């Protein structure tokens, strides 16, 4: 649906070249809710501006719904843009217009009939739960209600793609949760592909099925949300995951436990998925290795509706200790594990 092929973007500011994007490649599949996460200045917003051609790539290709738009003119982009809706952090509503007119604006600009406009706007306001607010003005609405108006406006043209640029950053946690639920409903009800730009890993965790992690203009990690949460490969991905899920004990706790430890030991970090959470893993390991297993840390969370568990286990070692059977057990049970040294 959206594909970036070795995309780079360079800006010239005060005779200085700034590389906003460097060799970015990934694909957003049809019906995905795809998250792009990174800190400020990572290149996220530049990336999304390439999709609706507010910026043009310096190198590489941007493919949208089968069209290579990299070198499209504004005229050539008109039909493509009809299939792309967008919502922003600060809503971008017309304060002088009612809720109804804000939502209707794209149809008014497209010179649709009054009958068609009334029918379509009414449908969208009902969908976002604001039918009773149609005659009010933006200043009379809460932040969450303003974003619902923006979502209705983005959907009124029946787009195939919805771009969300930090759409929940200005909202409180409860309102953020309600907006994410609405966006998930948008995806499921209309089959709209959503690309989420955010710096909040909780947004990725709660709504996205796939994610790209960006740092300094580059995509440093991609995968399903479950893959990235279960085994983040890069330091930045690990840092983002740790903001919403504690996946291992603190350094100070490990240091204290190591100081108190008598004899040699081996530690394992394991990731247990929903189908295995109720299994007697610790009991199995005790029987396999014939010794006690210490649980130094355990944390359960929910990712995409699935319960997962992170554990840090410790085995006391002696001359008879053999980790072959333990490793084999983890592999047979499809439990992701890592030996900690």
UniProtKB/Swiss-Prot annotation:
EC numbers for this chain: 7.4.2.11
Lipid bilayer topology: Peripheral membrane protein
ABC transporter domain location: 2-241
SUPFAM superfamilies assigned: ACT-like, P-loop containing nucleoside triphosphate hydrolases
Superkingdom: Bacteria
Cell location: Cell membrane
Keyword Nucleotide-binding: yes
Root EC class: translocase
A Pfam family of this chain: NIL
Catalytic activity field: L-methionine(out) + ATP + H2O = L-methionine(in) + ADP + phosphate + H(+); D-methionine(out) + ATP + H2O = D-methionine(in) + ADP + phosphate + H(+)
GO molecular function: ABC-type D-methionine transporter activity; ATP binding; ATP hydrolysis activity
Binding positions for ATP per the UniProt entry: 38-45
Keyword annotations from UniProtKB, A to Z: Amino-acid transport, ATP-binding, Cell membrane, Membrane, Nucleotide-binding, Translocase, Transport
GO cellular component: plasma membrane
InterPro entries: AAA+_ATPase, ABC_transporter-like_ATP-bd, ABC_transporter-like_CS, ACT-like_dom_sf, MetN_ABC, MetN_ABC_transporter-like, NIL_domain, P-loop_NTPase
Its job: Part of the ABC transporter complex MetNIQ involved in methionine import. Responsible for energy coupling to the transport system.
Similarity comment: family membership: Belongs to the ABC transporter superfamily. Methionine importer (TC 3.A.1.24) family.
Subunit-structure text: The complex is composed of two ATP-binding proteins (MetN), two transmembrane proteins (MetI) and a solute-binding protein (MetQ).
PANTHER family: AMINO ACID IMPORT ATP-BINDING PROTEIN, METHIONINE IMPORT ATP-BINDING PROTEIN METN
Protein name as catalogued: Methionine import ATP-binding protein MetN 1
Species name: Staphylococcus aureus (strain MSSA476)
